[in-house]
C-alpha cells in the first residue's frame, strides 16, 4: 500500500517539473547588431543645374568677369617752376640785380656740377638740372618705376641742390624735389613752368 502511493507522488512531481520547464521563455538567439552609418562613396554630392533650352532664333550672351588692371605710370622728370619754396623768385631776383651773374649748380650726392652763364634764369637752371638728373644711369633705366623704385626716387628728392654765384658770394640751397618734378608718390605729376615776380627778402639774400 505504501509503495503505490510513493510512486504516484513521484509521478505527479515529475509532471509538474516538466510543465514548469516548458512554460519558461527561451532566450532569443538573434544577436542585436549596432547600427552602421551609411557608407560614403567619397564622391561629393553634385547638384544638377537646370539646363537652358533655347527656342529657334534665340541666343545667349556670356560675359566673362574682367579683372581690374593697373596701368603703369610713366616716369617724367621735368623742371618744377615754381618750386616748393621761393627759390625761383630769389634766383630771378639775383639775376635782375647782379650784372653778368654766372650761376654754379652742384648736387654733391649725385655728382652733378655745371654752370649757367649765358642768359641765366631759373627756368634754364631747373631745366638743365632736370636733364642732368635724367641722364643718371639709375634714373634713365626707370621708364615705369615700381613702388619700391618710387620710394628710392623719393629718397633722391631729398638731396640738396646748391645754387650760387661765386663772384658775389650769393647762394641758395634747395632740395632736388623743390626744383625737379617726378619724385612724388604715388602719382608722378607734370608741372607747367610758371615764374612769379621777386618777393620777400630775396634782394638781401
Swiss-Prot record:
Family label: Belongs to the cucumovirus/ilarvirus protein 2b family.
Sum up the protein's function in the record's words.
Acts as a suppressor of RNA-mediated gene silencing, also known as post-transcriptional gene silencing (PTGS), a mechanism of plant viral defense that limits the accumulation of viral RNAs. May directly interfere with the mobile silencing signal.
Q: According to its UniProt record, where is this protein located?
A: Host nucleus
One BP term from GO? symbiont-mediated suppression of host innate immune response
User: Which parts of this chain are annotated as the region Disordered?
Assistant: 23-52
Determine if Oxidoreductase is one of this entry's keywords. Answer: no
What species is this protein from? Tobacco streak virus (strain WC)
Alphabetic keyword roster: Host nucleus, Host-virus interaction, Inhibition of host innate immune response by virus, Suppressor of RNA silencing, Viral immunoevasion
Major localization listed first in the record, in broad terms = host cell
- Judging by the UniProt lineage, the source's domain of life is Viruses
Instruction: From the Swiss-Prot or TrEMBL record, give the protein name.
Output: Suppressor of silencing 2b
Q: Which GO terms describe its cellular component?
A: host cell nucleus
Amino acid at each position: 500500500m505504501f509503495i503505490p502511493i510513493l510512486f504516484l507522488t513521484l509521478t505527479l512531481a515529475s509532471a509538474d517539473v516538466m510543465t514548469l520547464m516548458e512554460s519558461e521563455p527561451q532566450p532569443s538567439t538573434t544577436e542585436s547588431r549596432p547600427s552602421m552609418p551609411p557608407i560614403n562613396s567619397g564622391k561629393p554630392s553634385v547638384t544638377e543645374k537646370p539646363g537652358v533650352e533655347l527656342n529657334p532664333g534665340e541666343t545667349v550672351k556670356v560675359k566673362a568677369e574682367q579683372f581690374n588692371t593697373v596701368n603703369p605710370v610713366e616716369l617724367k622728370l621735368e623742371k618744377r617752376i615754381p618750386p616748393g619754396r621761393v627759390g625761383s623768385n630769389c634766383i630771378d631776383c639775383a639775376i635782375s640785380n647782379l650784372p653778368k651773374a654766372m650761376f654754379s649748380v652742384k648736387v654733391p650726392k649725385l655728382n652733378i656740377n655745371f654752370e649757367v652763364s649765358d642768359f641765366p634764369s631759373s627756368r634754364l637752371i631747373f631745366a638743365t638740372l632736370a636733364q642732368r638728373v635724367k641722364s643718371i644711369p639709375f634714373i634713365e633705366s626707370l621708364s615705369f618705376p615700381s613702388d619700391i623704385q618710387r620710394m628710392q626716387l623719393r629718397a633722391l628728392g631729398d638731396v640738396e641742390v646748391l645754387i650760387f654765384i661765386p663772384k658775389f658770394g650769393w647762394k641758395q640751397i634747395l632740395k632736388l624735389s623743390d626744383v625737379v618734378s617726378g619724385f612724388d608718390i604715388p602719382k608722378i605729376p607734370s608741372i607747367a613752368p610758371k615764374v612769379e615776380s621777386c618777393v620777400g627778402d630775396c634782394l638781401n639774400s
